[in-house]
C-alpha cells in the first residue's frame, strides 16, 4: 500500500532576515502555537539562506498534523530590492509629489529578473512593468 499523505494543519508566512532566524518573535510565537520544533526550523532556515545575508527572505512554512514541517523560501520583497538599488532607506511619504530617488531601466530589469519566479508575469517585460509600478508608488522615478 502507498504511504498515507500527511494532513496539513497550518500554512505560515513570515519575512525573516536571511541567516538570522532566532526563536524570538516573530518566529517563536508563530511556530510555537502549532507545536513545531522552533530550533530545528531556525537551523534549517539559516542554512538555506546563509548566501543571501543582508536581505529579508520571505518563507512559507507548511505544518503537518504530526508536527513536522517543510518550508519554501521566496525572493526578497520588491520594495526592499528597489530601496537597496536606489540607495535610500525608505520611500517618499507623498510619492506623487516628492520623489526621493531614481532607478535606471537596467536596475529595474535586474530586480525584475530576481523577482520573476514569484511574480505572476510571463515575460521579463511584464515583470519590469510591475517593478516600475512598485517603485513609482514609493516615490522613486524610473527612467534614463
From Swiss-Prot:
CDD domains: Ribosomal_L11 (cd00349). One or more lysine residues are methylated. GO terms for cellular component: cytosolic large ribosomal subunit. Coiled coil: none annotated. Keywords: Methylation, Ribonucleoprotein, Ribosomal protein, RNA-binding, rRNA-binding. GO terms for biological process: translation. The keyword Membrane does not apply. The keyword Transferase does not apply. SMART domains: RL11. It comes from the Bacteria. GO terms for molecular function: large ribosomal subunit rRNA binding; structural constituent of ribosome. Pfam families: Ribosomal_L11 (PF00298), Ribosomal_L11_N (PF03946). Part of the ribosomal stalk of the 50S ribosomal subunit. Interacts with L10 and the large rRNA to form the base of the stalk. L10 forms an elongated spine to which L12 dimers bind in a sequential fashion forming a multimeric L10(L12)X complex. Forms part of the ribosomal stalk which helps the ribosome interact with GTP-bound translation factors. Belongs to the universal ribosomal protein uL11 family. NCBIfam families: L11_bact. This is Large ribosomal subunit protein uL11. It comes from Parafrankia sp. (strain EAN1pec). The gene is rplK.
